[in-house]
């Protein structure tokens, strides 16, 4: 297939993806804003779709190989396809069976690119046209602007200069580093006063190239130190946050949006898109090294913490002990976060809870009350002082009345009353 034909197919698919269709805005998107309050105005479904479509268009225009193109359109299936190629061929397996839930148009388009010869042919043609140093012949006289009565033999030399196509009309293929080659030629001047004179001339030879914008070219030409300039990207006031499951970060509106707004599909209302981009199932992803479905984000048994273990089928941390609420006993409940039975008993103020025994325990005792000069009350679990029945109205000088012994005692015996 010719490269132009491939681009025509890709453009038609892009147009299909950009066609507006009836669709409801994701209700949960409002809860996952970054850098904005919940009270801020949410973009409507049309705005979100427009940004998503623009992102898709920019990604398609910026791809520079078949691998990048397929990664944008079919990320999970493309991983599986490359895995199967490394293992010796595309075989129908459990993961590929999920294709049955896709739309017929999408299956046909994806299946067309599973032909290895087509992919290889397109990729070879693509590589030939990329921006890179290419061997060219340059006219020596035109290169240096010599007088019309002077010419060189051979008239041309072979050097490397940057050439090829860029992925955007706003970019041009330019050299980022240059070396100089010395070549020996015959210089002839007419009228001929002497024979051809051997001369050594240095020619610029491009060693590396890059697609650059006009602004980057201007900066590089006018820079004292030649260096590549990083492309400027739009910056969000808030940092790129980790989005919830099935949501992706959008740099244009600086918030999380549902993945379905970003995914390529011929039918905007197809609710089976999520499975198309997730052939391994929920909480799993394809490991390109082993070609096996593994838990996302490198989840391992050690990541689950105490009292939990990793369920490799669901890729979720589950409780080891398999306890049920009925097994916890009276006044206890099963805590799914800690995977343990926790005490839920409510105790009176003067009988604090002992979490280990899950019992209300009295903190006072007859011995403790006696040391305070009080008596112990069993029903209330508290110390109390019995009132004096024969209280004296006055004590002699140097004495004071003691509520503890109900008599006058020397004042220096008096100690602060204990509650």
From Swiss-Prot:
The record's sequence repeats, renumbered to this chain, cover 280-295, 304-319, 328-343, 347-362
Annotated localization? Secreted
- According to its UniProt entry, this protein's organism is Homo sapiens
* Main localization of the protein described in the UniProt heading: secreted
A Gene Ontology biological process noted in the UniProt record is: substrate-dependent cell migration
Any one cellular-component term (Gene Ontology): extracellular region
Q: Gene symbol?
A: VEGFC
The protein's matches in Pfam families, at most eight in alphabetical order, are given as: CXCXC, PDGF
Q: Which UniProt keywords apply?
A: Angiogenesis, Cleavage on pair of basic residues, Developmental protein, Differentiation, Disulfide bond, Glycoprotein, Growth factor, Mitogen, Repeat, Secreted, Signal
Identify this protein by name. Answer: Vascular endothelial growth factor C
Q: Which cysteines are joined by disulfide bonds?
A: 131-173, 162-209, 166-211
Upper lineage is: Eukaryota, Metazoa, Chordata, Craniata, Vertebrata
Report whether Protease shows up as a keyword of the record: no
Subunit and partners = Homodimer; non-covalent and antiparallel. Interacts with FLT4/VEGFR3; the interaction is required for FLT4/VEGFR3 homodimarization and activation.
């Amino acid at each position: 297939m010719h490269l132009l034909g491939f681009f025509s197919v890709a453009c038609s698919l892009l147009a299909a993806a950009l066609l507006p269709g009836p669709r409801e805005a994701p209700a949960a998107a409002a809860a996952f804003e970054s850098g904005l309050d919940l009270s801020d105005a949410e973009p409507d479904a049309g705005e979100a779709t427009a940004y998503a479509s623009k992102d898709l268009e920019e990604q398609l225009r910026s791809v520079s190989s078949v691998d990048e193109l397929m990664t944008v359109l079919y990320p999970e299936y493309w991983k599986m396809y490359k895995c199967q190629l490394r293992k010796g061929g595309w075989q129908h397996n459990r993961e590929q069976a999920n294709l049955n839930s896709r739309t017929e148009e999408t299956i046909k388009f994806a299946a067309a690119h599973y032909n290895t010869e087509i992919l290889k042919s397109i990729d070879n043609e693509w590589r030939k046209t990329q921006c890179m140093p290419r061997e060219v012949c340059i006219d020596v006289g035109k290169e240096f602007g010599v007088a019309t009565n002077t010419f060189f033999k051979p008239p041309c030399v072979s050097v490397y200069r940057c050439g090829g196509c860029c992925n955007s009309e706003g970019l041009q293929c330019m050299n980022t580093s240059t070396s100089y080659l010395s070549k020996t030629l015959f210089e002839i001047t007419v009228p001929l006063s002497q024979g051809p004179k051997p001369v050594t001339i240095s020619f610029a030879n491009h060693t590396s190239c890059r697609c650059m914008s006009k602004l980057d070219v201007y900066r590089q030409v006018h820079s004292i130190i030649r260096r590549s300039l990083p492309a400027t990207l739009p910056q969000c006031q808030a940092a790129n946050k980790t989005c919830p499951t099935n949501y992706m970060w959008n740099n244009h509106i600086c918030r999380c949006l549902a993945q379905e707004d970003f995914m390529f599909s011929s039918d905007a209302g197809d609710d089976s898109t999520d499975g198309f981009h997730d052939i391994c199932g929920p909480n799993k992803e394809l490991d390109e090294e082993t070609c096996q479905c593994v838990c996302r984000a490198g989840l391992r048994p050690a990541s689950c913490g105490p009292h939990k273990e990793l369920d490799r089928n669901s890729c979720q941390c589950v409780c080891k002990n398999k306890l049920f609420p009925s097994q916890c006993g009276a006044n206890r409940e099963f805590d799914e976060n800690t995977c343990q039975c926790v005490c839920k008993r409510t105790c009176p103020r003067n009988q604090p809870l002992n979490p280990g025994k899950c019992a209300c325990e009295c903190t006072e005792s007859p011995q403790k009350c006696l040391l305070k000069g009080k008596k112990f009350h069993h029903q209330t679990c508290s110390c109390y002082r019995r009132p004096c029945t024969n209280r004296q109205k006055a004590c002699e000088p140097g004495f004071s009345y003691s509520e503890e012994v109900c008599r006058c005692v020397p004042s220096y015996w008096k100690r602060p009353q204990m509650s």
